[in-house]
């Protein structure tokens, strides 16, 4: 349903949207691929963090890597970095975070941002800003996870899309508050 609803927003690019096997823009492909992965509950789990890192992180990394023509090594390094950051943050915020928030959606945004920034060959300070920016884009509450409707499946798609936005912006020089994870009014 989402692929049909977003058909006019496909854009152009070399990322593959596995929903239909056609090329699309990076953000379009990542969004739909992450949603599809989570819809069929075909994603991994980091149980200690209550987090499914694969849907948002791998979907973002794969789309960016395909579009940029990145090597398999670059893709692997980006995914590993995205997992490392996402899983560590998920450990730090649980179990209280999951009471109101869907960790895959919130923390997934951070993992996707790191993977994207890595593939864009961002410097360390830019990767830090990608994380900081992504904390402002993180969302996905428990009501839509546990309640009626189809919103749950969109959570990792939004995380992948928002993470890509954060990674691209930071690699392009956009900055954010570097205490956004641990500040009094931060994540």
Regions found by a protein language model. Give the residues of each.
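N-terminal core-entry segment
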Residues: 1-187
């Amino acid at each position: 349903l989402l692929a049909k609803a977003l058909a006019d927003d496909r854009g152009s690019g070399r990322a593959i949207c596995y929903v239909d096997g056609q090329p699309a823009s990076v953000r379009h492909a990542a969004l739909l691929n992450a949603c599809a992965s989570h819809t069929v509950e075909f994603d991994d789990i980091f149980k200690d963090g209550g987090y499914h890192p694969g849907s948002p992180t791998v979907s973002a990394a794969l789309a960016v890597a395909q579009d940029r023509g990145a090597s398999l090594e670059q893709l692997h390094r980006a995914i590993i970095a995205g997992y490392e950051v996402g899983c560590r943050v998920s450990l730090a915020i649980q179990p209280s975070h999951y009471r109101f928030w869907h960790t895959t959606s919130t923390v997934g945004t951070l993992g996707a941002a790191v993977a994207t920034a890595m593939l864009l060959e961002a410097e360390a300070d830019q990767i830090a800003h990608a994380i900081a920016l992504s904390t402002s884009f993180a969302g996905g509450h428990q009501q839509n996870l546990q309640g009626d409707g189809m919103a749950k499946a969109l959570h990792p798609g939004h995380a992948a899309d928002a993470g890509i936005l954060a990674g691209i912006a930071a690699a392009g020089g956009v900055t954010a508050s570097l205490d956004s994870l641990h500040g009094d009014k931060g994540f």
